[in-house]
């Protein structure tokens, strides 16, 4: 085998044959090879103090290599080297100084070993110079110039006194360091500590109120160990306070501030200490001059490695291969910064007469998990006899991956739940197998070992020799905790658990345990749960937690036993009684709060109250109420006692214990309060908690419940009621749960919802579409599809409610509304009412102004043009009519979805096309029976029948339309203006409905000149217009416009609708309802397409109209069809009905009735009329507004009358 010994950066490969050499012999061979490699002069020498593993473990020179290292392993040589000696000086002037090799070996060699860099030589680099690395590397009896004469003799290192002061002097500096690492020694009380520190440093006392010091500091890194020892003054500003008062000089180091040692504090921590100190009136600083820097660095290292060696005499045990008397160990030369390693290693080598070490045996060195495992020195050998039964030996093995140098050591991997191993209880996972049935397995492969074990027959006994390192299954010993190393019943809870065992494949409880041993006294402090194995019995039970101390198992107390005995007792009890009962009873001690290392309290652990809250909460989450009762005794005072849990679990894991599978942090938090035994005041006193308790009764107001995002964003709708209650009880802001009310809207994003909630600060509130973008889609969607809420919005304009309560959003929120708080909703509605009312008032004013301007323009315009425009607009709602519609909508409070007009227009076009296609078919079928039907319905129908009978009817209509279409539209448009005013003015138009309907049906459109005048008259609501309309009708018949009757009827229906619309105002509720329905239809149908007019035209017979008007008005059919089938179905129906109504077939009249109900929303009808015209001629149809003008100008184009047909 071969071993590589590293001298700094130089590696020396030493062949070791079969590994039978001792470590001391390896050291000598490595040294010889290294000297050859260096090729230095005769005065150059190197001394190796010891060899270490790469992780810091020290090898015993007496060990055999095969037992402690593997082939091709790397070892680190802790050595010192010296250039040829020259002039010898002793600046200290101490008569004890000697230049003999003995003195050199005893003092200097030991000291150099402590600070010699890994590279084997001191490298002076620019960075080192900036950090103030001194170039004088030899002092005292070293044959080189020493430090300046101002160095005090006690600080130098003459024989006899140098080490006496060097070793202890660092103890003061390392006081906090030792606390951090749990290294408690009597050096802390050594009187020489302060003396030594004062010898090397100077004290500077400054006032914290004098302003900034004007110094530039960087971390003070030790050139020997690389540790941070304080703050290095890199520069001083000119004209600064430090410069003026001469407080500091460049290259000095601040190592202590107000009795706070800066050793091993990070730069940020040191700066913070400095800042805090400057806030006090007086600041006491210990400043290290550049010349004493190395001495200070060495002393810091020395104290870590020679505990209590302060008698001035080097009475230390030196490794055999090195004959010097140095007990100092090179600190962290291997690149490891673990003071614990240094401490344990030095303890192994040194025996201090001044510091009695209780527990006589030194702690085992820290080794890598596998390297050196099972050696004579590092582990104890245990012989275990396992009787092979029907279930086998009951364990599995694993080997280290060592493909480079052959098979590695073989370890026990798992103990199976059944078999000889679990019954015996002694074999553990991680044990290294050395022998099987007397045969050495070192160097054998895993397959060979398995074959050897399987060769044991059932009933025979397999004899195993295993090596077990205590440190392998017991935790790294906690750093010194002399006064608080064990949990006490007074400061912790005693819990009893009955945990059922399972057959999940894991042995026993499924927990990994750790123990603690006091470094100072060496006594065992008990065993604790280090971790819970996933899938094991404890994991499934969910009540055990990390760092619980086991004090009894199945009624057998573990207190007073050593850690090893307690482990054996636990293992035996679980394997025997536990397996028999299927249940394990555990009594544990659980500390109420999880501590955190506090370097200021002598290694004591303390943690904010939050940790206590967290643990208590977790406890209540994981345990039954009966088990939680002991928590009731926990008080905030108990939390602040800073209990120390004597296991390294606290130091190892800074994060809270992982939640059990039964309660994930974000899911089961509401269960915290369910434990009756735990008073919320115990763990919710005054700290801010990052958990949210869903039970409001347990929530003090002082707690800021910043619920986790996972909880906020994914609330459970089933808890909305309780959350609503909580909102009223707790003043805290819980915006997460309120989102549950908005879950019904799939288009909204959680973020927008959260943003909205924050804005409104109302727990259950319907989002305003204009406030939150995420809900805009829903609003527009509703607006486009459901017109049923347009009417109610009219009421909103009066200040009765908000848009969101009636429009499409109302439907979205219908789910959440019942869940919400009615009071909150009322408040919200009121607030929104005020805003809405103001907005709508402004809109109304604007709308009124626009309407007035329009009226003025219209008055100035040619009456014929005005009528045409209105007629076209009424039918298609294009161009100017759009604005009219907007103004009217504003007046009525229905102007909500103006932005959707384009979409509606597109839909309207599609529906027109469909209606047109169907219209053509119906025309042909119904034309035949139209005469008979019309004759039966109206006396004047014979004229219409003639037109319909005529195959050129549609064309004739077009020819006639130019005039009649204008009339038709004229009459409807003025009535519209009038009716709109009427309904609001309350003028009664209902009595004239019958006459008007009949007249409109046939007379409405034929007369252009008369219609405008008539239109003005109908506005007034007089009977004169009816007479004129009749005259127009007869005149049209005479002129040979048979279709005019139909067209008139159809147009009249639209006009009639307009008139009827005004009538609803006077009618009262019924009319209002009708009007609302008509309005809705009006808003929807016109956009959807004007199909109703056609229906009305055929059904136009005056008698029919009159009869239908009354029933239809009461009927809600018109309203319903527009709502439900608003876009297409209604139009289709209308189309079908229109044709039947126009034509004699009986089914048509049946449809007529419902359609006429729809007819009231005449505006839609007009629109549909153009659709019909378009149907007749798809080309012109596209531009409905254009069609009308064309009709007027060119008789060949389709007329509105044709569309009506």
From Swiss-Prot:
Residues 201-289, 383-468, 498-585 form the PDZ domain. Residues 83-104, 137-165, 318-374, 707-743, 784-921, 1111-1205 are annotated as: Disordered. Keywords: Cell cycle, Cell division, Cell junction, Membrane, Phosphoprotein, Repeat, Tight junction. GO terms for molecular function: phosphatidylinositol binding. Highly expressed in kidney, lung and skeletal muscle. Expressed at intermediate levels in brain, heart, placenta, liver and pancreas. Isoform 1 is predominant, while isoform 2 and isoform 3 are expressed at lower levels. GO terms for biological process: cell adhesion; cell division; establishment of cell polarity; establishment of centrosome localization; establishment or maintenance of epithelial cell apical/basal polarity; microtubule cytoskeleton organization; protein localization. It is found in: Endomembrane system; Cell junction; Cell junction, Tight junction. The keyword Cell cycle applies. Residues 838-865, 881-921 have a biased composition (Basic and acidic residues). PANTHER family: PARTITIONING DEFECTIVE 3 HOMOLOG B, PARTITIONING DEFECTIVE 3 RELATED. Belongs to the PAR3 family. Putative adapter protein involved in asymmetrical cell division and cell polarization processes. May play a role in the formation of epithelial tight junctions. The N-terminal part (1-351) part blocks the association of the tight junction marker TJP1 with the cell-cell boundary when it is overexpressed. This is Partitioning defective 3 homolog B. It comes from Homo sapiens (Human).
